[in-house]
Amino acid sequence: MSKRMNAIVPNAVALACALTVAHMGSAWAQTAANNDTLKLDELVVTGTASGASKMKQSNSISTVGVDQILQAQPTNSSDILRTIPGVRAESSGGGGNANVTVRGLPISAGGARYVQFQEDGLPVLLFGDVAFATPDMFLRADGSLERLEVVRGGSASTLGTNAPGGIINFISKTGEEPGGSMGVTTGLGYDEKRFDFDYSGKLGEKTRFFVGGYANMGQGPRNASANGVQGHQIKANITQDVDNGFVRLNFKTLDDKSPLFMPAPVSIKNGVLSELPGIDPRKATFYSPYWVQDATLSKNNTLVNSNVNDGLRVKSDSFGVETELKLAGGWKLSEKFRTSENSGRFISIFPGDDVANAASGTKYATGPKKGQAYTGKSFTATVFNTSMDDMGSTTNDVKLSKTFAQADGSKITTTAGLFVNVQKVALTWNFNQYLMEATDNNPALLANSKTNSYGAIDLGTNVWGGCCTRAIDGTYRTTSPYAVLGWEKGALSLDGSLRADQQVATGSYNQASNNQFKPENTQAINYTKNFNSYSFGGNYQLDKDTALFARVSKGAAFNADRIMFDPKKMPLDGSGVVPINEVKQVEGGVKLRNGNLSTFVTLFNAKTDESNYDATTQKSTSNKYDASGVEVEAGYKMGAIRINGGVTVTDAKIVATGLTPNRQAKVVYQLSPSYVLGDATIGAAIVGTSSSKDAQGSGYDVTLPAYTVINAFANFNIGKNAVASLGVNNLTNVLGYTESNDGRMAARAINGRSIKAGLKYNF
């Protein structure tokens, strides 16, 4: 298929999906509006000062229920986001480390710089783009999840710190419905077993509780390593209803180990990606039983040995308090508090060079063939081994609001709030390099005249010019007062909000030399940054089924580690200018119900000004971006048929060069049909993307081909309380590349086909 056809076909498919849904909606427009699959009248609480329905808000908001999440057959928490219009989720990193953004805002180095991941309305981590410590690593979707609320743009700029692009809020169950469930899932053709549970009940007339979680074990769909998947999460809460509101205690403990997936060696010729013999990017991990212990340096200059096969190991223990009270005089007080201890270790294998013929005299250094001659292909395996010493976060968000009725029938709602956060960013980086057999099936380490006896090429500060043996100890204290003023009369509502963020950064960072952290290399962190954000919007409801909205916003994302170790020697001790990443947005759209069809259409423009440093490419960048487009979310339901879909069309560019930002596709589309047939429900979640460019200007300019991935499921009710399920991720086993890498022939891909079966009992 030609490159032009690769670009045209996804556009045509997306347009056809949208037109098909619209046609069906018109054909059955006489059906009752209670089939509103987008739930436009549902109360949402994310990115808003006071809860209101989607139909009455001037924001673009999506809600995803548990049924839709299960239908999507996600492989991790960020994979769920691929089904939401306007969200770009590169969720091919395994148990975490996803790249997430919205509406053409750039992903310059990794993580989720412009989007805030929340759990029950508070940030998981204040920064979304800390290298080797992203918020999705500390999130797990399990039986405790009630729903997902996703705000793109809008008032996220003023109702969250570091959230100018949007807010992704994982909302937990709180025990409103007594009962529970137990379920077990097992991989078919691969080793992974998982147990999920949840239970709600009453402790008294006004006291209820909820507890839920999961435990899993195995190797995962890529058969990464023995016990590469192992862990558990337990979440619980107790709610005490009082006459004027409620008080809730929240608890969470997470201890999880999962594989990480880096770009795999590939061939790149004239910008075209292709597989290498023996390496399938859909299954490659380069974890293996033939690894040696990886010896690294601690901040105290002692040696630490790690099992490379541990992959991503995260621990999170949190405690929170939430209260909402109606006070005298019509005032309402809302407060949320949470403190979390977050830590772990990130270990993955990254190709440090291109695959080539092994040098003469190369032998197996590990494995059953140790000592035998090796004459095949090899590459340099760079082990990213980063200790997340302390990513703890403590947050309190309190707000006071009141609605004032006016003589002319209008209402004025005022809200004043204060957000306070203390975020620790303490990590220890170590990169070691080994010579590895070029295969994705339990590769061994190799030895020759350029390695030591067990295959190590370079260790510690000898790797990549000594760039990446690092110690970071930062503390970021953020204080953010905010205010919201809303006015409503009849069909028209207007709102404006302001936020004043102040961030005080303290601590130090150190780059080792000669395999030691030396006091004279310590650099101070000691600066204060301020930023004022705004958001103004309006919504006009033409009738109960149609509303128009518009909004203009300005917000920012503060920097943390991404401006440390800059080759330009940017001082962070308060003596120089510390950059802030700024976003300005304009958006407007329509919300419409027509019988069984619900539609949410938003036009948007976003301008971004950012600074960044990427450790893997060792490049410092400062760019302005401009992105315009349209996102469409639609849902249709009639009887046993349900279809949800969406399409996002984005025209983004780097202002200085006119180039499209790396990995930014013109079109991304989703389609999720399902059909109920007696006791059975069958369906699919289809996600596709047009082609995009990557690694521009690196010498390996690459076209990431268009692809469509189909996840399918079938559920069968066994009696009244049991459900058997069969799910397939990537049904057609498509090879979908999500990124390449500057300066070397490597690319990361989504997982290949995997099948799982499950049984769930509700009680």
Residue spans of the language-model regions?
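Extracytoplasmic beta-strand/coil segments of soluble accessory domains associated
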Residues: 32, 78-123
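N-terminal periplasmic "start-of-domain" segments of outer-membrane beta-barrel proteins
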Residues: 39-72, 96-101
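Short acidic/polar hinge/loop motifs at secondary-structure boundaries
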Residues: 123-152
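Short strand-turn segments of transmembrane beta-barrel domains in outer membranes
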Residues: 154-155, 167, 171-202, 212-223, ...
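Repeated loop/turn-to-beta-strand initiation elements of outer-membrane beta-barrel proteins
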Residues: 178, 206-209, 244-249, 331-333, ...
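Acidic/polar loop-and-plug regions of large Gram-negative outer-membrane beta-barrel proteins
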Residues: 234, 239-241, 246-320, 345-385, ...
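Structural signature of Gram-negative outer-membrane beta-barrels, strongest in the C-terminal barrel
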Residues: 391, 410-423, 428-430, 436-456, ...
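Gram-negative outer-membrane beta-barrel transporters
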Residues: 491, 596-614, 620-698, 712, ...
